[in-house]
Swiss-Prot record:
Residues 136-155 are annotated as: Disordered. This is Large ribosomal subunit protein uL3. The keyword RNA-binding applies. Belongs to the universal ribosomal protein uL3 family. It comes from Acinetobacter baumannii (strain AB0057). Part of the 50S ribosomal subunit. Forms a cluster with proteins L14 and L19. Keywords: Methylation, Ribonucleoprotein, Ribosomal protein, RNA-binding, rRNA-binding. InterPro entries: Ribosomal_uL3, Ribosomal_uL3_bac/org-type, Ribosomal_uL3_CS, Transl_B-barrel_sf.
Length: 212
């Protein structure tokens, strides 16, 4: 694992290369990530950097969180995330410090994790890309139904994990292998090539790709 950043999805746009090719990109706003805790092998059994970002009203912060943030000397954030790191990555990091977009460089490949858009209860066609049944030829009312799910006498039951209608979306999704197109240190903005999970305004985690 490697240290990354917590940001917020601003939306998608496009940029044009020198050759005039349109490239779809996603803009990620990254407020400075404040280090709230550094975990070590001696004290915690593993090495990690814990960060927070954004702001939260004091009335929404629990007493335990207030103590944790006060001990680190940082303002309360809207969330807390943790990155597993190596001994080398801990060098130069200290509680109360910040991590910004300069952690990444243009052309670097990253993985982006977010919470996908919730679609509610959906049928098999939308949820699992099932093909529909005949539109005519005697078929009525059953155009988008699943069909048989439990076979006949053998096995005579529905197997666990059978793809059926149910809740779609609103789950943790990671898109791997996205290229960083631009790093704006003045505005604290990252621009990555392609789409990332989640709705506009949702929190995302950007970290160096694990499949380098």
């Amino acid at each position: 694992m490697a240290i990354g950043l917590v940001g917020r999805k601003c939306g998608m746009t496009r940029i044009f290369t020198d050759a005039g090719v349109s490239v779809p990109v996603t803009v990620i706003e990254v407020d400075p990530n404040r280090i709230t805790q550094i975990k070590t092998l001696e004290t915690d059994g593993y090495q990690a950097v814990q960060v927070t970002t954004g702001e939260r009203r004091e009335s929404r912060v629990t007493n335990a969180q207030k103590g944790h943030f006060a001990k680190a000397g940082v303002a309360a954030g809207r969330l807390v995330k943790e990155f597993r790191v190596t001994e080398a990555e801990l060098e130069g990091r200290e509680v109360g410090g910040t991590i910004g977009v300069d952690l990444f460089t243009v052309g670097q490949i990253v993985d982006v994790t977010g919470q996908s858009k919730g679609k509610g209860f959906q049928g098999g066609v939308k949820r699992w890309n099932f093909r529909t049944q005949d539109a005519t030829h005697g078929n009525s009312v059953s155009h988008r139904v699943l069909g048989s799910t439990g076979q006949n006498q053998t096995p005579g039951r529905v197997f666990k994990g059978k793809k059926m209608a149910g809740h779609l979306g609103d789950e943790r999704v990671t898109v791997q292998g996205l290229e960083i197109v631009s790093v704006d240190t003045e505005r604290s903005v990252l621009v990555v090539k392609g789409a990332i999970p989640g709705a506009t305004g949702g929190d995302v985690i950007v970290r160096p790709t694990i499949k380098a």
